[in-house]
Amino acid sequence: MSKFILKVVWLDDNVALAVDQVVGNGTSPLTCYFFWPRNDAWEQLKKELEGKHWISEADRVALLNKATEIISYWQEEGRRRPFLEAQAKFPEIVFTGTN
């Protein structure tokens, strides 16, 4: 999954997920942000990644599995926790947030 970076915006009422592609020493946005629970972010991300046929199935599965972990954590306990705690729990994810 090192070719891609999962990015998360950690909010009080939503969590947003996006994917960037690693290009050289930087990154390039691959998807827009998808919000949970406002929308079905996981399903939207899945469709977006499936539409990019050059992304391997293994990379798609790894990204979606990590998205599942993030959404589950946010739903179960994370929304009541500061995003810095989530960032410590998932160090491979790029987090920003308001709390």
From Swiss-Prot:
GO process annotations (BP): translation
GO MF annotations in UniProt: structural constituent of ribosome
One Pfam family, short name: PSRP-3_Ycf65
UniProt keyword list: Ribonucleoprotein, Ribosomal protein
InterPro entries: PSRP-3/Ycf65_sf, Ribosomal_PSRP3/Ycf65
GO cellular component terms, A-Z: ribonucleoprotein complex; ribosome
HAMAP family in UniProt: Ribosomal_plastid_cS23
Family assignment from sequence similarity: Belongs to the chloroplast-specific ribosomal protein cS23 family.
Protein's job: Probably a ribosomal protein or a ribosome-associated protein.
Family matches, as PANTHER family: 30S RIBOSOMAL PROTEIN 3, CHLOROPLASTIC (PTHR35108), OS04G0461100 PROTEIN (PTHR35108:SF1)
Subunit comment: Part of the 30S ribosomal subunit.
Name of the featured protein: Probable small ribosomal subunit protein cS23
Organism of this sequence: Trichodesmium erythraeum (strain IMS101)
